[in-house]
């Protein structure tokens, strides 16, 4: 898809509200520092990426496409609650990062395929229910953005699942919408291969998937491919959480149909005042985006109910995010409340929330099974949008208005498949 000058202007106009009061921050923050803060907590994650490697160890991976998949073992130190609110990423104001006040990488090692499998097996054994959580980021994310965002989500939800970050080649630019979208297609087979491996690994008992924005397209397409190839999806794929999905609503209808009746529990987070998705709708021929539908209107209400899709409508939730594309980020108290309710096995309704703002469960039935998995369904998207990527928007708007931009161009390469061990249903 070609994104022209008019579309670029629309994107910049829609995002310009984020610029006010936004200070720039250091980039290339991933060079490990000494673990000097005993009060900080640690999040260990497995990274699977189709990005090209960077020559700069503080960047690790660029926004270009790698010729082969890569894996990494990353540990992020997160400062204590006394210096950070739930839903926030404490980006360093200067380098090196200070673990006492900032998110800081204390370990970053590339892994071989076998090393990645060893990491996964060891981490899954530490999980009480032998579960994994796969996170897939959205449009306009640098590698470090996705790492710190997922670390925050894992910390703020208190998940015991083994965390796997799937990060695809995004250039971290509002003017690279077309490139980013094609990069999700480029990564589709690789993600399916990872899903196939998780499905056939006997150590993994449960898989939850969390995707945001454009990352939902990648998640849904890979699940669809897997279902067609295998004649359905495995029972261990329990939860798929779609946060503000930038997906054509008509295409979603066909994707979920192709997965068959025995699909995971889908939870859809929507907001009709999502300005980013309004711009996307213009780009894609005025077709509604899944993340901004009115779930109470026909035909959506009936179709979602028939597919047992739980919808959480956040339209009336007040947000500090001027795009309304990541309301969990600016309303962390709501996420905490929802997570607490769901962890207790309680169904979410308007009256249970007990706040002035309204959260609507638009479909019938319970949100998911009781227990930790149920809590994860709702509480995981604590910060779907990383507010600290905003300086990118400033650079891109400046380039449109004729001002000088500080954006740098990365060099790149090509194709990938996550080379996990081939099993039945996996392509070699």
For the regions a protein language model found, what residue spans apply to each?
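Bacterial N-terminal signal peptides that target proteins for export
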Residues: 1-10
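Lipolytic serine-hydrolase domain surface
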Residues: 23, 27-110, 117-121, 126-127, ...
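Short substrate-entry loop that stabilizes the transition state in hydrolases
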Residues: 141-146
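Alpha/beta-hydrolase fold active-site loops
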Residues: 131
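Long, low-complexity, intrinsically disordered segments
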Residues: 405-428
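The conserved beta1-alpha1 loop
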Residues: 134-138, 212, 244
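C-terminal motif of bacterial Sec signal peptides marking the signal peptidase cleavage site
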Residues: 18-21
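Gly/Ala-rich beta-loop-alpha elbow adjacent to hydrolase catalytic centers
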Residues: 211-215, 219
